[in-house]
């Protein structure tokens, strides 16, 4: 890992430090869950208008998908910190499961050709 590509545990620590200094404290988990839904909605709006069939409004054109995805990640990291979830370990377990369970699953899928 490089400084430009930190492991998830470093991102979790960075969010925790920001919350405890600039943010004062974490919002309660249910508030963060609502905020996560809001941020995902902002991503959905961009996707529907920029990559889907909805027309993109002039006011939507300046919105940055990467910034909105980062907002989603920030709230996910907050929720992980609040619940004591080690996302680095959870990520590795999820990838191990996908690599073993889905190793050949998608190769014969005609929808992906």
Residue ranges: model-predicted function:
Residues 1-69, 73-113:
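Flexible "arm" and connector segments at domain edges
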């Amino acid at each position: 890992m490089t400084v430009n590509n930190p492991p998830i545990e470093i991102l979790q620590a960075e969010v925790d430090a920001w919350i405890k200094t600039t943010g004062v404290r974490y919002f309660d988990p249910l508030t963060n869950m609502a905020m996560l839904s809001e941020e995902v909605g902002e991503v959905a709006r961009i996707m529907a208008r920029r990559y889907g069939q909805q027309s993109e409004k002039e006011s939507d054109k300046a919105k940055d998908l990467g910034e909105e995805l980062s907002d989603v990640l920030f709230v996910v990291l907050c929720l992980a910190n609040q619940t004591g979830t080690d996302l680095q370990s959870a990520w590795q377990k999820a990838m191990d499961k996908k690599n073993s369970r889905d190793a050949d699953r998608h190769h014969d899928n005609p929808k992906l050709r």
